[in-house]
Amino acid sequence: MTFRPLHDRILVRRIEAEEKTAGGIIIPDTAKEKPQEGEVIAIGPGARDESGKLTPLDVKAGDRILFGKWSGTEIKLNGEDLLIMKESDVMGVIEQTATVKKAA
């Protein structure tokens, strides 16, 4: 089954956080917070402005995003837990930058 978001909605898969702290302490499931980072799976066509013109979304499928703790609606699709949210719930896109090694 496929899912196509409408308007300015996006479909997001949460990216699970680390299960250990930097000091090596394992965090139990009961103490974990929901991750606020995810990967965009699908996007809608965009929102319409006052004149009726379609405004495309800034995010695209494959983007890694940050969103609020209580953003979106949780759904289960093909046995996978996903989120549907409006683009306005997205705080920003995480861009992967290539690390540049400096010569010593």
Curated annotation (Swiss-Prot):
Alphabetical GO biological process terms: chaperone cofactor-dependent protein refolding
Subcellular location: Cytoplasm
Record keywords: Chaperone, Cytoplasm
GO cellular-component term (any): cytoplasm
CDD domains reported in the protein's UniProt record: cpn10
Gene3D superfamilies: GroES chaperonin (2.30.33.40)
InterPro entries, per database record: Chaperonin_GroES, Chaperonin_GroES_sf, Chaprnonin_Cpn10_CS, GroES-like_sf
Domain of life where this protein originates: Bacteria
The keyword Chaperone is annotated on this UniProt entry: yes
One family name in Pfam for this protein: Cpn10
One GO molecular-function entry: protein folding chaperone
Family according to the record: Belongs to the GroES chaperonin family.
Subunit record text: Heptamer of 7 subunits arranged in a ring. Interacts with the chaperonin GroEL.
HAMAP family to which the protein is assigned, alphabetical: CH10
NCBIfam families reported for this sequence: PRK00364.1-2, PRK00364.1-5, PRK00364.2-2, PRK00364.2-4, PRK00364.2-5
Its biological purpose: Together with the chaperonin GroEL, plays an essential role in assisting protein folding. The GroEL-GroES system forms a nano-cage that allows encapsulation of the non-native substrate proteins and provides a physical environment optimized to promote and accelerate protein folding. GroES binds to the apical surface of the GroEL ring, thereby capping the opening of the GroEL channel.
Name by which UniProt lists this protein: Co-chaperonin GroES 2
Organism: Mesorhizobium japonicum (strain LMG 29417 / CECT 9101 / MAFF 303099)
Source taxonomy: Bacteria, Pseudomonadati, Pseudomonadota, Alphaproteobacteria, Hyphomicrobiales
